[in-house]
Every structure is written in structure tokens, then in C-alpha cells.
Amino acid sequence: MNKRAEDFLSFLATEKGASEHTTKNYGIDLREFSKFIAEKELPGLTYLDIRSFLAFLKTREYSKSSISRKLACLRSFFKYLVRENVLTQNPAAGIATPKKEKKLPSFMNPDEIAKLLDAPAKNSWEEKRDKSILEMLYSSGLRVSELAGLNHDDLDFFGGLVRVRGKGKKERIVPVGQAALNSLRAYWDMKAPRENASAIKKPLFISRIGSRLTDRSVRRMVLKYVKRTGLGKEISPHTFRHSFATHMLDRGADLRSVQELLGHANLSTTQIYTHVTTQRLKEAYASAHPRA
């Protein structure tokens, strides 16, 4: 199974445009499943093997969201194997996805955002880069994989726009705020000497040695500034995206526009943020109204 799994992960990355984060997690899921089925051959697998694996995960107290992801991974893997004529049918196709716990996305308030955006304050190349990354995450609501994948020619300084390659290689154009543009210019001026002049596609955000920043590098960088500011809460690059959507809706943006900015395929994915803003209104009402 291992060779088939490697081919599948390569297919995801090259043909489906899956992020580094997704391919890494799917690799973990497939290794776990391979260990569970032991020496059983792929063509001999049935839906009962998949159900047994899911039951095993439940006994190990995996969350419903983790089990759902592992099932989604297996569905995609077996679909790929059917396409490659390794299997005649997908044994995971008819298995229902466990209902996820409805968890509202966490976000930062404007004061917390301001503290984080001001955290990279040194006049160094690295902190200029870090500030522009934080500004971009909040200004345009990008996924970390989308930000890491940006190239020079994706950014339109004069128009204040950026071309983003989202999930499934779908492109969208997103505005970039003035504060983010100013930070990008400051970083840009110090960036040129470190670039790889021979690179055809020049990455927008680079490491000390001139290579493209990875998703993991951006996550580590965000954590560094969270610790520096002492905010005392769990914050990741995706928290900036949640904050972007919540603040946009708080200030009157319509749901469809926010959906387009975030690159959500379904409006229902964006609607979770309306629950966040409604909950905040209820809390404000309960704490301030004399007869609440």
C-alpha cells in the first residue's frame, strides 16, 4: 500500500493543488490506516474494513472532526485507486461522515490584532517581512498556503490587489489594504539582495537563504509574535482569517462578498461567521440591557 499512498500524495500535490498541510495530514492518515489493516491487500478491502477502522479510532478517543478527515482521506485515496484501475469500486463511498461538533471559529478583537501587527518592530529585513505577512493575513483573509504560494507577479501595488490561488487551484482577486501595502513596500526594498535571480517564479515571501517560505515557517513565525505580545490565547495564521471575516461582517459587509473574498465554494461555509457576530450581539445585550 505504501507505494500507492506515495503516488496518491504526489497526485494531490501536483494535479489537485493540495496544500503542504493537507498532504502531510493525509500521509499521516494513510500510514495509520496501513498499520491498522496490516498485511491485507488493497483489492480485498471492503466497507467493513473501513467501518472497523473508524470504530477503532473512536475507541482511541479521536474527535469527530479528526475521524471525518480520515474518512475523507480514505474516500479520496480509494477514488484515485479506482481511477488508476487498482480497485473496481470505492469501499469508503457509502459510509456516512460522522456529524461534527458545531464549533464557532475563534477570532481576535481589533486591539489584539493591533498588538500582533505591531509586534515585529525591529528595523531588520526579517521583521519587515514578518510584519508584511501578518498584515497580509489580516488585510486579505488568506489561508496560510495561499500566502506562502504568492509570487512577485501576483501583487498589483498600484491597483491594491493580489491574485490568490486557492483550494483546487481556483484563482481569485482580493483587495490589499493600504497598511499591508506600506509594509510590503518596506519589506520589498530590503528583499532584493536575498532573492534567487535565476528563479522563474519569484516567491513573494522568502527565507534567509532566498527559498520560498513554507506553511510551517509561517505558523512558527506567528507563534513567535503571539508569545512576544503575551496575548495568552491560541492564535494561528487561520485565526487572522477568522478575524478578517468576523470584522467584515461586524461592519456591514454582505455575506456573498465575504464568501468571494474568502474563496469559499459554498455560502454555508461562510455563514458560520454570522453565528459568531450574532452571539456577540446577544452577549452585549445580556450584559448591558437593564431587562435582558
Give the positions of each predicted feature.
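Conserved catalytic core of the tyrosine transesterase superfamily
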Residues: 1-292
